[in-house]
């Protein structure tokens, strides 16, 4: 599938989802039990995962998949939101932003795997 025709849409929608993640993570930092915020972050990560996968951006897909998994654990009560987790999530957001900037500049997400974030 030739995805080049969808690149501009992908970039615009990714910017929106990253802004949502940023806004909601700031709320989560202050209100770690806020279920609406937790659900909003889960949905944004899920949407980004699907979009990245469709476009073939595997690194972005993997990172958002891992973020989605974390929020599924939080939603199910198996994990609590702690300051250390929020810090890791902000690092993940920074990595996603870097992937997007690479995509904007080169149409490629780059080669950084961000294993240290994924394994944190």
Locations of regions flagged by a protein language model:
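N-terminal assembly/transducer modules of large multi-domain enzymes
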Residues: 1-120
């Amino acid at each position: 599938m030739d995805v080049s025709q969808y690149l501009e849409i992908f970039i615009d929608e990714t910017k929106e989802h990253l802004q949502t993640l940023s806004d909601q993570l700031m709320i989560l930092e202050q209100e770690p039990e806020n279920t609406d915020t937790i659900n909003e972050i889960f949905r944004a990560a899920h949407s980004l995962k699907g979009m990245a996968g469709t476009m073939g951006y595997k690194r972005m897909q993997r990172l958002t998949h891992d973020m989605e998994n974390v929020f599924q654990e939080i939603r199910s009560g198996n994990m609590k939101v702690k300051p250390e987790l929020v810090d890791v999530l902000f690092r993940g957001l920074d990595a996603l932003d870097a992937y997007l900037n690479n995509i904007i500049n080169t149409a490629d997400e780059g080669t950084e795997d961000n294993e240290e974030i994924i394994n944190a």
